[in-house]
């Protein structure tokens, strides 16, 4: 179908963030790699070098970049994949009406204009990053990640601060490609990188690396379109998402996903069960292993980087949820529970798990083992159903590892603060330190409309305790499908949580940006304050609501305190006077009864 004829080519947000430019650091082992980072320039009066930060926005934030959504992004990794000599191109499966929910005519989203033959592993080969790591091979993806995780640390080594409690995580001062290989080989980290998604920039998920965040997008049977979902993906990447999950449940799932993957610099995850359910017209009881298997291959050929598989929902666990306040809240979990009860047999996901591993191994699709029995209310947190499923996920992890498949484990959910650490400790023990990937958790149930905050609290805590990736929650959680603005709010909230966790864990480069912003704040460099923040646009707009003039951008006060009550301005005055008179003279002055301090013995006791 001619995409131009229907005039629906989406437009997406492009252009650099304020005072920022993209820089690239080359590889040593693989000199052809170029690792992107964002350099934030500071005002000349600061006397400070630019601040380098992690950047996952792809080409969309390059000044003057020629972005053509109908052409997709450059296939960054394709030559790396082909050079290994263990893959082959093949015809692949044909798109069928059920792949797009039987949409037709004007309701059918057009196919992506340029499709290439998919790749798969040659017979007997494992093309996963785990297989390469176990064989002692440092892939270009691994070196790319090592450079990316260092955040330019070689140049900033003297300014690094090590301060925190890591709860057993071992974050090195300098990440090497060999360290990345070792962590992947041990199963403590994954590199979600399907051989059919060469547009994605390599990233890593593991507790000995920076805490990552995921943003969920996707249409529903009620609302949204391909153009909106592609823009949501780009928008999420712009504000700092590390991966995106396409959780579409309506029509056009196949074609929308193709547009997203071809334009995504981020790994893309899915829940294949959702599309499989659409193929049987939404009737859970009609699901079969054959339909599900076909869906896995379909999505793997497109380039999905990780699958959420709810294989831990077993028939004999379902009665454990009967007395819960909120039952089974996972969509995938409830679908499989309904199927198991109707057929009164074990889940086909559990029974065919080794075959699922064989498919994932063929394309290097990572597992995200789903928590289908996660608690949906704090009353249900840490119950028998939740932890029974976790034990099964630990068993499945060992099976996947034996097949050279990469694995992370999904976690809750709704958990009050005092029960969060138990989740992390159990997961590490039961799942062999496979990376933990949690939805929040939400720490209270009383705040619909503010669940990005209730969950951000839990996310910061569990990230500190060792969770490797945090799945964002938006203000629309429990209320509706997030729009573009909700996506940004969710991403920024979770960037805060992830960064707070990195600080608490003692990540050596985490505090550099905080300190740079604090110095800018103390020195009243307003533009630097805005530009160093996670959301420069919002910071600037809040300031300008009350002090909009350009002259206010150099003022030594804000509208909160005004010029006479600004604590930082008073601190400057104290410093200036101290430098003028000398600290000792100042101390003597105060001891003699200065205007700031009163001797303790001069204070009259209270009458009571």
Swiss-Prot record:
Residues the record lists as binding Zn(2+): 414, 478
MF terms in GO: 4 iron, 4 sulfur cluster binding; carbon-carbon lyase activity; zinc ion binding
Single GO cellular component term: cytosol
Gene3D superfamilies: 6.10.250.620, Radical SAM ThiC family, central domain (3.20.20.540)
Domain of life: Bacteria
Sequence positions that bind [4Fe-4S] cluster: 558, 561, 566
E.C. number(s) listed in UniProt: 4.1.99.17
Statement: the UniProt record of this protein carries the keyword Kinase: no
Residue numbers binding substrate: 216, 245, 274, 310, 330-332, 371-374, 410, 437
Record field: catalytic activity: 5-amino-1-(5-phospho-beta-D-ribosyl)imidazole + S-adenosyl-L-methionine = 4-amino-2-methyl-5-(phosphooxymethyl)pyrimidine + CO + 5'-deoxyadenosine + formate + L-methionine + 3 H(+)
Pfam families: ThiC-associated (PF13667), ThiC_Rad_SAM (PF01964)
GO BP terms: thiamine biosynthetic process; thiamine diphosphate biosynthetic process
Keyword hit for 4Fe-4S: yes
Cofactor requirements of the protein: [4Fe-4S] cluster
PANTHER family registered for this protein in UniProt: PHOSPHOMETHYLPYRIMIDINE SYNTHASE, CHLOROPLASTIC (PTHR30557:SF1), THIAMINE BIOSYNTHESIS PROTEIN THIC (PTHR30557)
Subunit details: Homodimer.
Family: Belongs to the ThiC family.
Protein name: Phosphomethylpyrimidine synthase
Lineage summary: Bacteria, Pseudomonadati, Pseudomonadota, Alphaproteobacteria, Hyphomicrobiales
